[in-house]
Amino acid sequence: MCIRDRLKREVVRVNITIETDEDDLIGGFRLVDGDTVWHNGPVIEALEKGAVLLLDEVDLASNKVLCLQSILEGKGVFLKKIGRYVRPAAGFTVIATANTKGKGSDDGRFVGTNVLNEAFLERFPITFEQDYPTPVTEAKILAFHCEDKDYIKHLCDWADIIRRTFKDGGIDEVISTRRLVHIVKAYEIFGNRAKAITTCISRFDEETKEAFQQLYDKVDADVSFEV
């Protein structure tokens, strides 16, 4: 994981869904050999180890994540079911990722996200907005999966054009870095540039798919999408 490698810290990752509750996060009793035994959740593990707690896709959560309020204030948490107070060890940090910054998705691009409680959001003091990587950085990412530098350059230029067109309102969809990785991996399988792109953009509607293909034609004259 990039966060772990960059910080050289242990990272405890929790994938948040609408079903995530206090039992999933803080912990609860489990049946072990006929007895009920308390089992710490990932949040308590991170607290006690002084690790980085990563709440991934936190805007998919319900109001059940409000059980984290005191932890986000740096005060630790009282485990009322077993009568124990857990203080955060030195270095404990909470990071959350969210596609909508906790404001929900009005355009429907991130269906399932929710508007999070304002008091909950206020407990995150710093927000970083992560744009797409520059073409140079994106090329380095793709180079981990593909050796064709020429193809990588064309893909990065293509994605950059699509994103600028999207921002200008010319198209309704965008190509992510993850989608580019899918494409170069498909290229390693098929050995065909056009087929790799087509198979990986077929999840979009036909109009968007054709628009993407036409935009790629502008950066790579050697590729044809004709059947």
Locate each region found by the language model:
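C-terminal regulatory/interaction module of P-loop NTP-utilizing enzymes
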Residues: 1-227
